[in-house]
Amino acid sequence: MIFDRVPKKYTVESGGQIQACGTSGFLHEVIRPSTPSKEVSITLPDTILCEIRLFSKGQLPDTVQDWEAPYNDCDMLLLPTHADDEHIFFGGIMPYYAGEKGMKVQVAYLTNHWGEPYRPHELLNGLWEVGIRAYPVISEFSDYYSEALEHAKTLYDTEKMLAYEVELIRRFKPEVVVDHDINGEYGHGVHMLNTWLLQQAVEQSGNAQYFPESAQKYGTFDVQKTYLHLYPENELIMDVDTPLKAFGGKTAYEVAVAGFSKHVSQQKWFSVEKSGKYDCRKFGLYRTTVGLDSGIGDFFENVTFSDAPDPLPPKEESTQETASDIQTESSDTVSKTESTLSFWYLIPIVLGGAVLLCCII
């Protein structure tokens, strides 16, 4: 199911069993009814449902976004400022490390695009295309344009933003963090702000005196390696031209371009480049606790992994009592829709406490 906004809690009833859903905060969500049935009733209070697709038992197509929860402990944390930055400036990192090598790459955005409802969908579509499977973190900070760092600082509560970045590091415990060019890529003040904040966050995340609330919740953590796009010192040039088996022989660059193509609204302004001023291959090691790179082009060179393999998050489950509590909050209005298996249909309506009944024939 694809929602217009992150849904409130809702229920799915199948074979007399009621599941509580909508607790993950996913905009695109796969629900597996607890009991096989030819009739499924979905109760959606005050929610806009854009698309729903039904499948028979078996493996889902690769194009279906069956998101996992954000990692408990990731290998790499990417910190793009806006939706699409992760492809334009970080290029082949996600296709290679997440898609090809199967490493735990967590993406967390400094700003959100809830004021442009189509962009969060583009964000998810792009990430899925390049091999990201852990749901991204999207901050509460709105997107504003700025042409200078000092101006950008006036647009936000920078202490609150710094707390956010410190908490991300402590929560996800990445061995490697990647962020923007210090000069804001093309001069965007909020890109500059993002990196200015990270430069402080990597120094503070290991000290419990800074932001003690997140230190108490997640513990402290010191990142081993911090890379910045286009940073001129300790340069790393990423190989984005080697064919990747996970993507049928496409290169990391080609996959990055395909990921950015999902950001339909941004195509006339930007592109993914592997040369020139905004070369997506070029990074520099800004901070390290494990020594300098040798030049082999691997972000994880010299890194020591201390975490155990991350278990797959459990599929959404809840007790029938909790589900019933949610269902009680909604009205008895019923909208019945019939569909054959694997059939797409669009529901551009606000379901204010409505019940969607899917009859499978």
Enumerate the predicted regions with their spans.
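Residue-level signature of transmembrane alpha-helix interfaces in integral membrane proteins
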Residues: 96-100, 147, 241, 246, ...
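C-terminal membrane-anchoring or membrane-association module
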Residues: 351-361
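Active-site beta-strand->loop->alpha-helix modules in alpha/beta enzyme cores, enriched
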Residues: 3-9, 16-211
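Short, Lys/Arg-rich cytosolic juxtamembrane segment immediately N-terminal
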Residues: 335-343
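Generic alpha-helix signal with a bias toward terminal, lower-confidence helices
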Residues: 95, 139, 214, 238-240, ...
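The feature marks non-catalytic terminal segments
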Residues: 5-16, 22-33, 67-68, 204-332, ...
